């Protein structure tokens, strides 16, 4: 097992439902440590830049509109196999297909408003973390 960092977004729908603490608690109970966290209101430019890989997809405009519809929580999580662990906790992208007890099964209502985002690889995590956090904003958790 390897100590990794991954990136997480608690999306506008989950922030509006006031379940930020419940979601973060799930990360922590699974052995992931929050090493950076902040609430941000994404601009269209920021959201479009973050999701640029989807810019040619039919859902892109709706995705950008959703991600700018309210504040989000961006976080860096650290732990053993953090990328895979976070993806397991989130559940399937479509909450109707997500296993019971996963974040999306419990808090999401649709594939479009699915509560959370998580990096899909270590390379994506590094890129996504750098998009939102300066190196000085990510804190070592040695205690």
UniProtKB/Swiss-Prot annotation:
Pfam families: NDK. It is found in: Cytoplasm. One of its GO terms (biological process) is CTP biosynthetic process. ATP binds at residues 11, 59, 87, 93, 104, 114. Keywords: ATP-binding, Cytoplasm, Kinase, Magnesium, Metal-binding, Nucleotide metabolism, Nucleotide-binding, Phosphoprotein, Transferase. Its cofactor is Mg(2+). Its EC number is 2.7.4.6. Gene3D superfamilies: Nucleoside diphosphate kinase-like domain. Its main location: cytoplasm. One of its GO terms (cellular component) is cytoplasm. One of its GO terms (molecular function) is ATP binding. It catalyses: a 2'-deoxyribonucleoside 5'-diphosphate + ATP = a 2'-deoxyribonucleoside 5'-triphosphate + ADP; a ribonucleoside 5'-diphosphate + ATP = a ribonucleoside 5'-triphosphate + ADP. The keyword Manganese does not apply. The active site is at 117 (pros-phosphohistidine intermediate). InterPro entries: NDK-like_dom, NDK-like_dom_sf, Nucleoside_diP_kinase, Nucleoside_diP_kinase_AS. HAMAP family: NDP_kinase. Major role in the synthesis of nucleoside triphosphates other than ATP. The ATP gamma phosphate is transferred to the NDP beta phosphate via a ping-pong mechanism, using a phosphorylated active-site intermediate. Belongs to the NDK family. Homotetramer. This is Nucleoside diphosphate kinase. It comes from Stutzerimonas stutzeri (strain A1501). The gene is ndk.
């Amino acid at each position: 097992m390897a100590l990794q960092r991954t990136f997480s977004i608690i999306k506008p729908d989950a922030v509006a439902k006031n379940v930020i603490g419940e979601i973060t608690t799930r990360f922590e109970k699974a052995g992931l440590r929050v090493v950076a966290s902040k609430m941000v209101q994404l601009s269209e430019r920021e959201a479009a830049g973050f999701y640029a890989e989807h810019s040619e997809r039919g859902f892109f405009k709706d995705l950008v509109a959703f991600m700018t519809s309210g504040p989000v929580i961006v976080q860096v999580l650290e732990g053993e196999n953090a990328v895979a662990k976070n993806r397991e906790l989130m559940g399937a992208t479509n909450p109707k297909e997500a296993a019971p007890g996963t974040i999306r099964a419990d808090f999401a209502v649709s594939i479009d408003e699915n509560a959370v985002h998580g990096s899909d690889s270590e390379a994506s995590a590094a890129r996504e973390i750098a998009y939102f956090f300066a190196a000085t904003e990510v804190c070592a958790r040695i205690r």
